[in-house]
Every structure is written in C-alpha cells, then in structure tokens.
Amino acid sequence: MFDLIKAIIIGIIEGLTEFLPVSSTGHIILAEALMKIPSGNVWTKAFSSVFDYSIQLGAIFAVIQLYFDKLNPFSSKKTDHEKFQTWRLWIRVIVGVLPAIVFGFALNDFMDAHLMNFWVVSATLIIYGIAFIVIENRQKSIVPVITNVNQITFKLALYIGLFQVLSIVPGTSRSGATILGAIILGASRFVAAEFSFFLSIPVMFGVTFLKMGSFFRDGGSFTGMQSIVMLVGFIVSWIVAWFAIKFMMNYIKNNDFKVFGYYRIIIGAIFLVFGILGIVG
C-alpha cells in the first residue's frame, strides 16, 4: 500500500513539474527526502532509477495526446500542404534533438554521478530562476519575431537544441532551458513552450529505452508489485501532466514566466537549506 502511495505522489510531482520550467528532478529529490514512506523491497536503487524515467515517459504521453492532431502527418483531415508542414515540423524537431544525442546521452551518466548533489541542484534552480526574471524584464521592450511554430527554421531548431543540452546539469529543467533559449532567439512564449514540448518526445523516448535496455542487460527484472507500482506512476504522471500542460499554455497567453523564476529561487533556497541540514544529499 505504501509503495502505491509513493508511486502516486511521485507521479503527481512528475506530471506537475516535467513541463513547467521548474525542474522535475529537484522536486522529486525533495519529495523522496521528505516523505519517509516505508518502501519494503520494492524501491531498490535500480528500480527507482527506471521508475523515474518511466514516469517521465508517462508525462510525454500527455504531450502526444494533446498535440496528436498537430503532430500527425497522416491525418485525413489535413491538406497535402498541411501534411508537408507537419513533416517539416518533425524534421525540425529531429534537428533540435541532435545536440542532446551528441552531448546529452554521452554526458548524462557522468553528470548524474558527479553533479547530482544539493549544491548543484540548488544553484541551478536559483540561477535559472534569476535568468527567467532578467530575460522576461528584457522582453517587455522586444516584440517576438517567431509567433508560429512553423516559423522555426532548421538553424534555429539546432540552436534551441543546444540550450536543451544545458538540462543535463541536475536542477536545470529541460523545458526551462529550451524555453529560455527559444525566447532569447526570438520566439514568443507560446511557441517556445510548444516547441519545448515537441523536443521532449524523442528525447524522453530515447533516454527511457536506453535506461530500460541497460537495466535488462544487467540482469534486472521487475517483481509483480514493481510492475504495478511503475504502471500506477506512469498513469498518474500522464493524467497530471495533461492538466499541467493545459494550465501553462492558458497561463502564458496573458502572463510571462517570471512567476516560475521567483518560484525556482524559493525552491532553490529551500533545497540549499535542506542540504546543509542533511535532509537531502
């Protein structure tokens, strides 16, 4: 029972924070440190790692569900021109994930091993929080030149993808890095968020299957309870992420990202204090 409660709580946190620019990793670390829920033999180190990636995949399914029509090049509802535009969008997404493939996958394990500590996570939470506030203040006098995702060029997609690589540093936030990058490069908030969602699809599928493959190659297997726990976390993350995406896209129609910047600074400060007190490692 406690295992399912933990899966539900972490699934909720993942769903809420994966696409908001606030760092899902930082929030999950905090939650796991504070919950102290008895977890029996289910939450082994290997299973916990795979679980974290499986719930990220659940959040990705929310993107696919919400944007299925827009991302489906085979839709009978689309004209030939619209299908062509959809294929072009997918090519730009692929171009955008190339930096993550080249740098991210190569450095991800190194970063987790050497930078996954409260000093780094709290610092990146605070630094990017300040960055959001500074950049949004600058944007007040700048009119975005890219107001539709189809206006993103291949070159621009690659540059945004380079910003995504920054998220391999724990606490950065993948969506936060790509949204900031896209805004700096001239995209509107709406386009920046939308393209960030699309970039997450191949990245998270790739990372999840790599982690799963590594788990099984090392002789790992799931017990019946672990399978149930993973499925529950996956579904909860999917459902909550659906609402989180809807909320954010409605919110940024009339608001900027500064509130997320202030929030990151507060959470970063809390994370730092908890780290100094030994509550998180």
UniProtKB/Swiss-Prot annotation:
Q: Which UniProt keywords apply?
A: Antibiotic resistance, Cell membrane, Cell shape, Cell wall biogenesis/degradation, Hydrolase, Membrane, Peptidoglycan synthesis, Transmembrane, Transmembrane helix
Residues annotated as transmembrane? 2-22, 46-66, 93-113, 115-135, 152-172, 190-210, 228-248, 259-279
E.C. number(s) listed in UniProt? 3.6.1.27
Q: Write out the GO MF terms.
A: undecaprenyl-diphosphatase activity
UniProt KW Protease keyword: no
Q: What is the membrane topology noted in the UniProt record heading this document?
A: Multi-pass membrane protein
User: Which compartments is it annotated to reside in?
Assistant: Cell membrane
Which reaction(s) does the protein catalyse, per the Swiss-Prot or TrEMBL entry? Answer: di-trans,octa-cis-undecaprenyl diphosphate + H2O = di-trans,octa-cis-undecaprenyl phosphate + phosphate + H(+)
**Cell wall biogenesis/degradation recorded as keyword:** yes
List, in alphabetical order, the GO biological process terms annotated in this UniProt record: cell wall organization; peptidoglycan biosynthetic process; regulation of cell shape; response to antibiotic
Q: Its GO CC terms?
A: plasma membrane
Q: What Pfam families does the record tag this protein with?
A: BacA
Provide the family line. Answer: Belongs to the UppP family.
Record HAMAP family: Undec_diphosphatase
Purpose of the protein: Catalyzes the dephosphorylation of undecaprenyl diphosphate (UPP). Confers resistance to bacitracin.
Quote additional remarks: Bacitracin is thought to be involved in the inhibition of peptidoglycan synthesis by sequestering undecaprenyl diphosphate, thereby reducing the pool of lipid carrier available.
Instruction: Provide the protein name.
Output: Undecaprenyl-diphosphatase
Organism expressing this protein natively: Leuconostoc mesenteroides subsp. mesenteroides (strain ATCC 8293 / DSM 20343 / BCRC 11652 / CCM 1803 / JCM 6124 / NCDO 523 / NBRC 100496 / NCIMB 8023 / NCTC 12954 / NRRL B-1118 / 37Y)
